[in-house]
Amino acid sequence: MFEVRKIFDRTEGDVRLTAFETCGQVCSRQIDIETDGEVIKQVRYTGGCNGNTQGVAALVAGMKIDEAIARLEGIDCNGRGTSCPDQLARALKQL
C-alpha cells in the first residue's frame, strides 16, 4: 500500500544511481538516491516540504544504508501511515 516503485537504476563505476516514485500518500513525488556500496552519497527529493527533505537528505549523506533504514522506517506524517523519511527507508530496502 505504501510501497515505492523503482523507476530508474544505473551504475557508474562504484556509484549506483536509483530513482523511486513515492506511494502518493506523501508530498514528495520522487526520491533519487546515490550510493557507493553500503553508504549513501546523496539523496534528492522531488516535491515535499523543501526544508524537511533537504534536512533528511543532509542527515543521511555518508550514513550506511542499514542505519538510515533503522532510523527512518515507520515515521508517520499526520496519520498517513507513511512519510517522506519512511518512503526513503522503503526505497533503501530495495537496494
Task: Cite the ranges covered by each PLM segment.
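Structured beta-strand/loop patches that form or line metal/cofactor-binding pockets in enzymes
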Residues: 1-37
